Structure formats: structure tokens, C-alpha cells
């Protein structure tokens, strides 16, 4: 693992600032890119010494994010993989920072409980019985 030093603290603030700005911005619809275009623009991102967090964030912001179709764009109706609200994004940050594994009750009872609550709510909206599952 790594230590949380001044450099890590600066990177954390840069990432959180990016996340807040992105969640508060009406996104461009953007478009996909070919692997060749991304290789030319992003370069080699996996290196023996690493590229560092600041450079990784720059590549994400300037190259990779722009090669993703923003699913919170008002004209995007194909998929809805997550809740496009600022609160949902911030809770994603909180859960990621906690670094929990929610794949089974033993390791992540709290996360699994929260997920089950959400699934039960969605099932009730669809009119499924309380015994539904799967």
C-alpha cells in the first residue's frame, strides 16, 4: 500500500475538485474513440515506475473521459448504469474510499444490507412480492 503524504493529499484534492466540477457541469455528449486513437493520445499508461496520480488524472480528464459517452447527458437514453446526482456521486466516492468488498455478507454486511434495501425497494416499485429475489 502507500502512505498518505503531502503529495497524496494534493492529489486527493485535485480528484475531489474534478469530481465536484464534473458532477455540477452539464456534460458534453462526447463520443467513443478507436483503440488506435486512444493509444496515440493517451500513450502508454502502464509503466514499470508508474505515471503518477497527477498524470493519470490529466490523461483521464483530457483524453479518456472525453472518449466516453456521458450517460447523464439529457439526450442520452440508452443505458442508466448509475444515479446521475451529485449526492450519488459523492456516496460513490465515500464507498470507494472505504475500500469495502460487498460481494458477500461475511466481508461486507453493511454494503450488502444497503444493496438489498435498494433492490427490495425497486422490486416493490415493480409490484414484485416481498419474497422476490435472484
State each model region's role.
Residues 1-131:
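N-terminal entrance/gating region of PLP-dependent enzymes' catalytic architecture
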Amino acid at each position: 500500500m502507500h502512505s498518505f503524504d503531502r503529495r497524496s493529499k494534493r492529489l486527493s484534492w485535485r480528484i475531489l475538485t474534478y469530481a465536484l466540477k464534473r458532477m455540477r457541469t452539464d456534460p458534453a455528449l462526447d463520443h467513443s474513440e478507436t483503440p488506435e486513437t486512444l493509444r496515440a493520445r493517451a500513450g502508454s499508461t502502464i509503466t514499470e515506475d508508474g505515471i503518477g496520480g497527477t498524470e493519470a488524472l490529466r490523461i483521464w480528464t483530457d483524453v479518456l473521459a472525453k472518449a466516453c459517452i456521458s450517460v447523464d447527458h439529457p439526450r442520452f437514453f440508452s443505458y442508466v448504469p448509475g444515479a446521475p446526482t451529485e449526492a450519488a456521486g459523492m456516496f460513490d466516492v465515500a464507498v470507494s474510499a472505504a475500500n469495502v468488498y460487498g460481494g458477500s455478507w461475511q466481508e461486507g454486511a453493511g454494503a450488502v444490507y444497503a444493496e438489498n434495501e435498494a433492490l427490495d425497494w425497486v422490486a416493490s416499485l415493480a409490484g414484485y412480492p416481498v419474497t422476490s429475489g435472484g
